[in-house]
């Protein structure tokens, strides 16, 4: 269930739920626009998490952009003591932001190729290229199938040579795939069989 992020830029927050257990993927903020004059930022309504209390097994972050981590403090207020998983850089951003708000959180490192258990969910982090390094897609095993959550990504080379999307580590047999899409100006073009050409 999406708490935000559908049909809009930002507010990325999606809940996977099985019986009495749930997992939150991303906790992003939205930004003011011409339809919201005077508003700088917007956060998802985390009342759904608050109602579930300790059944929230984990918050898993795909990358360190504000539209994916900016509302984490509010998610943790709704579901205190929930472990937060993310890549090293993402957790660095999160740690600083939470410290500014006086929030002590259980932050846990996600490493591509090393799955983690969160209740009935098994999360497989997969490296993806994006405009911020250390970005992840997630293959999430549930009791009824595998859900592929891409986070933001691009299918061209990332800012660092080793930050390419690991297409070999995708989720074969995934039951569902969820992927945000936002229009972006291309920074390079990739052609099958021809390598990379910068524009």
Regions found by a protein language model. Give the residues of each.
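His/Asp/Glu-rich metal-coordinating catalytic cores
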Residues: 1-60, 65-199
């Amino acid at each position: 269930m999406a708490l935000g992020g559908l049909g809009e830029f930002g507010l990325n927050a999606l809940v996977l739920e099985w019986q009495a257990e749930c997992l939150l993927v991303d906790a992003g903020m939205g930004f003011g626009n011409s339809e919201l004059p005077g508003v700088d930022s917007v956060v998802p309504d985390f009342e759904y998490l608050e109602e579930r209390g300790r059944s929230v097994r984990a918050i898993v972050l795909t990358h360190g952009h504000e539209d994916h981590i900016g509302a984490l403090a509010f998610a943790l207020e709704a579901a205190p003591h929930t472990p937060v998983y993310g890549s090293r850089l993402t957790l660095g951003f999160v740690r600083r932001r939470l410290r500014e708000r006086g929030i002590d959180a259980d932050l846990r490192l996600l490493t591509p190729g090393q799955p983690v258990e969160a209740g009935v969910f098994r999360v497989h982090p997969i490296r993806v290229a994006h405009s911020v390094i250390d970005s992840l897609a997630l293959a999430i095993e549930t009791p009824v199938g595998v859900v592929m959550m891409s986070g933001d990504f691009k299918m061209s080379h990332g800012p660092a040579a080793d930050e390419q999307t690991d297409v070999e580590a995708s989720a074969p047999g995934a039951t569902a795939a969820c992927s945000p899409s936002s229009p972006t100006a291309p920074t390079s073009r990739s052609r099958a069989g021809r390598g990379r050409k910068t524009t």
